[in-house]
Swiss-Prot record:
<keyword id="KW-0963">Cytoplasm</keyword>
<dbReference type="InterPro" id="IPR036679">
    <property type="entry name" value="FlgN-like_sf"/>
</dbReference>
<comment type="similarity">
    <text>Belongs to the FlgN family.</text>
</comment>
<dbReference type="InterPro" id="IPR007809">
    <property type="entry name" value="FlgN-like"/>
</dbReference>
<protein>
    <recommendedName>
        <fullName>Putative flagella synthesis protein FlgN</fullName>
    </recommendedName>
</protein>
<keyword id="KW-1005">Bacterial flagellum biogenesis</keyword>
<dbReference type="GO" id="GO:0005737">
    <property type="term" value="C:cytoplasm"/>
</dbReference>
<dbReference type="GO" id="GO:0044780">
    <property type="term" value="P:bacterial-type flagellum assembly"/>
</dbReference>
<dbReference type="Pfam" id="PF05130">
    <property type="entry name" value="FlgN"/>
</dbReference>
<comment type="function">
    <text>Required for the efficient initiation of filament assembly.</text>
</comment>
């Protein structure tokens, strides 16, 4: 039982680290100039924690079957307490992930609008135009 408690604590700690990374990602996405290297590093760290959490979940499932207990662990106070904290962290992570996704989509949209405007400008720049007096203008 102690091993299951430790695994659930590890899952909670990894989720808290993931939450910290999501806040860093959010702060970086809000900046007008995004540091791509920082974002890439954050993504790599998020992938690391997600793999670690997936591995811990497999161990947790094995121990739950072995002890024949399952979430929300109502009959075990310590497990239930940690499980409730995990659930609340997951809700916060979901909200932050949605915020990050919205900001990222807005940045892509603005970037695409800029590229489209720039292409139109370049196309118009190559066109030959004539002034009021009929002479070529550049």
């Amino acid at each position: 039982m102690k091993k299951l408690i430790n695994i659930i604590k590890d899952i909670k700690e990894n989720l808290m680290s993931l939450q910290n990374l999501m806040h860093q990602e959010y702060d970086n996405l809000l900046k007008s100039k995004i540091n791509i290297k920082k974002i890439k590093l954050i993504i790599e760290e998020k992938e690391f924690f997600l793999r670690k959490i997936a591995s811990l979940k497999k161990e947790k499932s094995f121990l739950e079957k072995r002890y024949n207990i399952f979430p929300p662990y109502l009959q075990f106070n310590e497990l239930n307490l940690h499980w409730d904290e995990i659930i609340s962290i997951c809700f916060l992570l979901k909200k932050k992930n949605i915020k990050n996704k919205i900001i990222l989509n807005e940045k892509f949209y603005l970037n695409q609008r800029f590229l489209n405007t720039f292409q139109k400008y370049r196309l118009n720049q190559n066109n030959t135009t004539y002034g009021v007096d009929g002479h070529l203008e550049n």
